[in-house]
Amino acid sequence: MKVTRYLLYPCLLMAASASAQNTMTSSPYSMFGLGEMASGLYGQNTSMAGVTVGMREGMLMNIENPAGLTALDSCKLFAEASAFVKNERYRSDGSSSSAFTGNFSAFSLGGRIMRRWYMSVGVTPYSFVGYYFKSSQELEGSPGTFVTSTFSGTGGLSKAFLSQGFLLTKHLSVGMNLNFIFGNMTLNEIQSAMTVSREMSGRSFYADFGLQYHRPIARETFLTVGAIYGYKQRISLKNTVTVTGSNTETPYNQKRVTQYLPQYIGIGSSLAHKKWTYALDYLFRQYGVLNSSDSRVKFRDSHELRLGVCYFPNGF
C-alpha cells in the first residue's frame, strides 16, 4: 500500500528595509514602471541570495525554474508559506531615510502527479510599490520661496501560477509556468492644498520556461546546470486620476497605460556535496522596454550575478 506523507514547510525569511504596514518595499525607485520587481522571495532561495536557476532538492518547490520540481520527494505533498522582513536605507542630496518592512511573500502547494510529471500551484508577488518622500523646490520668480511636494505610493502586482515539471530522461528535466498577473498601484502627489492620486490596475496571462541537466559527478556529489526564459508580454493598465482640492474631488478616466513584463533569460548551476550546496546564477532582464510618463526617466537593462551557499544541519 502506498503511503503519502504531508510536509508543512513554513519559512520566516530574514533579510534587511522599513516603513508601511502592508508594503514589501520602501524604495523610491518603486514609483517607476511596474514597481520593484520580485524574484526568489521564498524558502531556501532567499537565504541563498535568491539563486534559483540551478537549484533542485527534495523539499524545494522551485517556481522560478519549474524544471526543478522534478526533484521533489515523490511520496510527499508539499505546502510552503513564506514571509520576510528587511531594512533599507537611502541617501540623496545630503538627506537620508530608512525603513523597516515585511510581509507575506509566497504560498505554494505541490508534489508529484504522475511518474514523470510534477506540479505546483500558488500565489507570489510579481512587483512592489511602496515609497514616501518629500521634495522642496524654489519657486521660479520668487527667490527664497520654496514649494514642498510629498510623494507616496502603495500596491503592486501579484502572480498566481500553475507550474509543471517533466522528467524527460534520468538526467534532463523541463518545466513551464502558466501565470496570471494582476494587481493595482496607487501613486499620490500632495502639493499645498491639492492632491493628485493616480490609480492603475491591470491583468495579463503569461508563461515562462525552464530546463535543468542534473547528474552525480562523484560519491555524494551532484551537479545541476539550468536555464530559464520569459518572453516580453504586454499588459494594459486602467488609469484613473483623481484631483482633490480644498472643497472638491474630481476623478478623470485617462487613456489606458501600456506597459510590458520584461523579457528575461537566466543561466545557473548548483553543486551539492553531502550537507553543503553551492549555487551561482546570471540573470539578464530587459527593463529597457518599460515605458515612463516622465521623459527624464529612462530604463536600462539589468545584469545580475547571484551566489549562494547552504548548509543542512544534522536531522534535516
Regions found by a protein language model. Give the residues of each.
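Generic detector of contiguous secondary-structure segments
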Residues: 12, 60-69, 191-199
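Outer-membrane beta-barrel translocator/receptor signature
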Residues: 55-134
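Short coil-to-helix leader/linker segments, especially the first N-terminal amphipathic alpha-helix
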Residues: 6, 11, 53-61
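Generic recognition of cysteine residues
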Residues: 6, 11, 75, 166, ...
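Outer-membrane beta-barrel porins/channels
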Residues: 21-47, 94, 108, 112-316
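Bacterial Sec-dependent N-terminal signal peptides
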Residues: 1-25
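Transmembrane beta-strand segments of Gram-negative outer membrane beta-barrel proteins
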Residues: 27-52, 70-87
